[in-house]
């Protein structure tokens, strides 16, 4: 099955592993797999080389029975060991480099050196706190209180033709995207909708899952309290 077809069906849980933060990335991956995660995202906003991400993906693939997908923080974070890559465009960045500049460079690299890697074009929309991703990409995060603005961005992403929209509250965010914000994006975007950042409990995961995103991502929780992953995943599956 193609990665796109896998992602667009139902609501899944993905675990984000940032090798720059997690020395014990295999331990986190094992926890996540045992808890029932549906996939692994690998990447981060800072300090990851191509050789590093290649080794991390190879190691995780050796134990994983689910897709392992690159979540790149820069054009150096690519490897053909993965099942696919989220080809991110930060729609609300104030710097054109993060909207289209890096994508031009990355597209050439993908075509020349990673032709077998499945590419999922992804409109990356920073909300709320934004975290490191918002800071590094020089974004103007959308306030939690403005689902109407998120809807406008998601509608634009739909008309442009992105395969996915990713609502990102940021790593370790104080709160996740509120349900009404997820609902607003879902109303106008018919393909893959991803929500991540600030999800720390089964109750919160359940309220988000009820809005029918395709993927709910947890990262900081997996690093700090991996034993809670089971609670999150069960809540998503029960929604």
Swiss-Prot record:
One of its GO terms (biological process) is glycerophospholipid biosynthetic process. It comes from the Archaea. Pfam families: PcrB. GO terms for cellular component: cytoplasm. Mg(2+) binds at residues 18, 45. It is found in: Cytoplasm. Pathway: Membrane lipid metabolism; glycerophospholipid metabolism. Sn-glycerol 1-phosphate binds at residues 166-172, 197-198, 219-220. InterPro entries: GGGP/HepGP_synthase_I, GGGP/HepGP_synthase_sf, GGGP_HepGP_synthase, GGGP_synth. Its cofactor is Mg(2+). Its EC number is 2.5.1.41. GO terms for molecular function: magnesium ion binding; phosphoglycerol geranylgeranyltransferase activity. It catalyses: sn-glycerol 1-phosphate + (2E,6E,10E)-geranylgeranyl diphosphate = sn-3-O-(geranylgeranyl)glycerol 1-phosphate + diphosphate. The keyword Cell membrane does not apply. Keywords: Cytoplasm, Lipid biosynthesis, Lipid metabolism, Magnesium, Metal-binding, Phospholipid biosynthesis, Phospholipid metabolism, Transferase. Prenyltransferase that catalyzes the transfer of the geranylgeranyl moiety of geranylgeranyl diphosphate (GGPP) to the C3 hydroxyl of sn-glycerol-1-phosphate (G1P). This reaction is the first ether-bond-formation step in the biosynthesis of archaeal membrane lipids. Belongs to the GGGP/HepGP synthase family. Group II subfamily. This is Geranylgeranylglyceryl phosphate synthase.
